[in-house]
Amino acid sequence: MGTRPTDEQYGAVCFACRCYEAECVAVRLLARSETSAQQLGFKLLKRGFEKRVVESVFPVLKRYSWLDDTRFARAWLRNRVDSRPASRAQLLGELKRRGVSHADAEGALDLLFQEQDEETLCLRLLEKLRRRGYGPHTLQRALQRRQFSPSLVRRCLAVETEGA
């Protein structure tokens, strides 16, 4: 008969099994939808995985490009801007709250704003709010709350008024 594993060896095997289990759960979650590393970490912790297990899984997921905050930021921005236009400043804040680094968020925003400018987003939101029955003063406040600059808001309101 062989020798029994030491407590240290047994602990290492248990840790490796737990990491494999966390990796499988993470891949299933990522297959459903793109997510940031921070969001994935929260989901894994919520499912009962220890922090050190979660942290050891991230390098594997990144090495195989299953977890990529830059890709998440780009996908999230496309979806977010299509459904709810917002200013660059607001989008940056929302990406950072989702755990995307400032550099990754800025890079994704630069790409987005190469395709469409902030004025276009402001005008789209203005049109959407106008259809909901917002009046001129309410429109101005709503656009400024979404962190469009006061000068851009005035310009968009003027363009929208000319077109009406």
Swiss-Prot record:
Top-rank taxon: Bacteria
Entry similarity comment: Belongs to the RecX family.
NCBIfam families: PRK00117.5-2
Function: Modulates RecA activity.
Protein name: Regulatory protein RecX
GO CC field: cytoplasm
Species per Swiss-Prot/TrEMBL record: Treponema pallidum (strain Nichols)
Pfam families: RecX_HTH2 (PF02631)
GO biological process: regulation of DNA repair
Listed HAMAP family: RecX
Key words, A-Z: Cytoplasm
Subcellular location: Cytoplasm
